[in-house]
């Protein structure tokens, strides 16, 4: 048989050349020729019959083929069919570049299914199979390989779901190659992550960043083998120009500082153990973070392009972004790393702010934290008001708290407005089922720490006034005066945003830099580790594994 020889030739050349481009070109040429040649020898009426039978099990696919009078969608010499097939094969060839499971979209598997095909029955089956592979590819590219909530219940993303028949109808009426491009996440971050993935893969295949640093700590001015190992690793990472210096000198201090900045830790230029541990992280681990970030971008197609707020939990930061540019940034404190206190990921609409807010204590905090304290001392939380179901203030001294448990405690708690209020002097509201919001805090000292996971889930802002001024600048020529006027009332004042602002609580451990390169953050809640494990189960692999 001629075609088995072609297949063997393809495998031989792909292995011999070890060049992806050559392999992909061969795949395209061979695949198109095989598909087209088989279709030429088939009987059209019989093909339609078997297309109808093969598509019967999938209602959407069956409806689509019925609308085409069961004409093949991919096979044959029809110009549109050939163009669609070329675009599909090109897309499937590139699937691993996007961090998709290579096994699911393997051209070898599809080609093996048509090996020796000579019957209309198999040809009809093949056209339908190509349709099913296409639909899976389109779904994965537009919504992700995984379902976020199945990985972690606190990852809530409104995925860009589309019915199968919609993909097929759009492809049928579109330029094939342009259609496949539109399936990609539209964000600039996705494009940058693709470039960084390719860069890291090249580094990985060339041996990585070199030997690990074995020292526990290195001091400025120190000389020796440990400093040389630090120097060489930072040179490999691109933080230091090639040098033979064996001294922890000023250029090396600067390189360490830049590395620390890119990893979200205190940039003091000292190579302490925590910094050295980060420098020793392998290319493989960094590449995993990028693959997870690509998957997260596929979950987040709805992120705004105009004014929006981004709260990156791992970066402990909140940003206001206008037309792609960060116009305001402040430090944050996020939820403590505990199953009940971790901050969730979701998107919503920031609608208003409350100046001089009261704190209505969540019941979980009331019964789990404050009730045990009140059982010991009736005045333990005298900074809070105790109220009954009618809103009447109750004196704690009149209550025997020992008679209540978490289920029977009947009272609510409120902290009045004031400088010592747990919410500070302002809160920013985007009403949601998680009861999460952004707010000021009287505990400013926590913002001096690198890792700031201390709250019950809400997001504390280091500079809430600046955040408020930037938001209000869209509706006032003097936002500071507007805000401070409300502050002067010493009671709750609600300020509506004339144009509500989309807000996104995200979780990124790999973040691209505009000029190239990556920043990394700690997987504070372990969510990315769970995502990577799930991606592996689905068949996503590192380049070193694929060859």
Positions of predicted regions on the chain:
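Short, intrinsically disordered, low-complexity terminal segments
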Residues: 11, 17-20, 36-39, 51
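Short coil/turn segments at secondary-structure junctions
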Residues: 10, 117-121, 218, 243
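N-terminal secretory signal peptides that target proteins for export/translocation
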Residues: 1-17
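Cationic-aromatic interfacial patches
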Residues: 41-160
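Phosphate-/polyanion-interacting regions in eukaryotic proteins
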Residues: 152, 164-171, 180
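Bacterial N-terminal signal peptides
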Residues: 19-33
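Well-ordered beta-sheet/strand-loop patches within structured domains
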Residues: 38-66, 128, 132-135, 155, ...
């Amino acid at each position: 048989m001629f075609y088995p020889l072609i297949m063997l030739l393809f495998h031989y050349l792909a292995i011999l050349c070890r060049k992806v481009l050559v392999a992909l070109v061969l795949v395209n040429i061979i695949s198109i020729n095989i598909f087209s040649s088989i279709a030429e020898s088939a009987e059209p009426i019989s093909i339609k019959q078997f297309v109808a039978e093969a598509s019967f099990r999938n209602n959407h696919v069956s409806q689509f083929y019925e609308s085409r009078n069961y004409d093949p969608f991919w096979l044959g010499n029809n110009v549109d069919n050939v163009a669609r097939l070329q675009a599909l094969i090109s897309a499937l060839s590139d699937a691993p570049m996007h961090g998709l499971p290579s096994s699911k979209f393997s051209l070898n598997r599809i080609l093996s299914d048509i090996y020796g095909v000579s019957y209309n029955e198999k040809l009809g089956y093949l056209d339908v199979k190509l349709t099913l592979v296409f639909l899976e590819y389109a779904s994965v590219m537009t919504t992700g390989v995984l379902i976020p909530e199945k990985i972690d219940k606190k990852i809530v993303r409104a995925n860009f779901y589309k019915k199968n028949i919609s993909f097929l109808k759009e492809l049928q009426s579109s330029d094939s190659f342009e259609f496949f491009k539109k399936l990609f996440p539209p964000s600039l971050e996705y494009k940058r992550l693709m470039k960084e993935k390719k860069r890291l893969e090249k580094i990985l295949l060339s041996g990585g960043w070199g030997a690990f640093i074995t020292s526990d700590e290195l001091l400025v001015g120190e000389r020796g083998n440990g400093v040389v190992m630090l120097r060489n690793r930072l040179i490999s990472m691109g933080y230091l120009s090639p040098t033979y210096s064996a001294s922890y000198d000023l250029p090396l201090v600067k390189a360490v500082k830049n590395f620390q900045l890119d990893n979200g830790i205190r940039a003091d230029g000292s190579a302490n153990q925590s910094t050295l541990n980060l420098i020793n992280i392998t290319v493989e681990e960094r590449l995993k973070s990028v693959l997870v970030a690509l998957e997260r971008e596929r979950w987040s197609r709805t992120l705004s392009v105009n004014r929006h707020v981004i709260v990156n939990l791992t970066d402990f930061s909140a940003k206001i972004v206008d037309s792609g540019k960060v116009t305001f940034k402040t430090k944050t404190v996020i939820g403590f790393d505990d199953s009940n206190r971790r901050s969730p990921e979701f998107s919503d609409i920031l609608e208003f702010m409350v100046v001089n807010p009261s704190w209505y204590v969540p019941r979980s905090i009331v019964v789990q934290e404050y009730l045990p304290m009140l059982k010991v001392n009736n005045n333990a939380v005298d900074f809070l008001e105790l109220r009954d179901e009618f809103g009447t203030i109750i004196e704690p001294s009149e209550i025997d708290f020992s008679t209540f448990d978490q289920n029977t405690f009947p009272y609510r708690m409120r902290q009045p407005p004031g400088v010592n209020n747990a919410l500070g002097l302002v809160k920013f509201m985007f009403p949601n089922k998680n009861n999460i919001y952004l707010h000021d805090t009287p505990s400013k000292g926590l913002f001096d720490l690198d890792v700031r996971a201390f709250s019950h889930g809400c997001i504390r802002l280091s500079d809430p006034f600046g955040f408020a001024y930037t938001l209000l600048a869209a509706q006032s020529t003097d936002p500071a005066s507007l805000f401070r006027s409300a502050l002067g009332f010493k009671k709750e004042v609600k300020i509506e945003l004339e144009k509500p602002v989309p807000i996104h609580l995200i979780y990124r451990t790999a973040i691209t830099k505009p000029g190239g390169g990556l920043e990394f953050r700690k997987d504070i809640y372990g969510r990315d580790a769970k995502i990577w494990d799930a991606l592996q189960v689905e068949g996503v692999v590192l380049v070193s594994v694929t060859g």
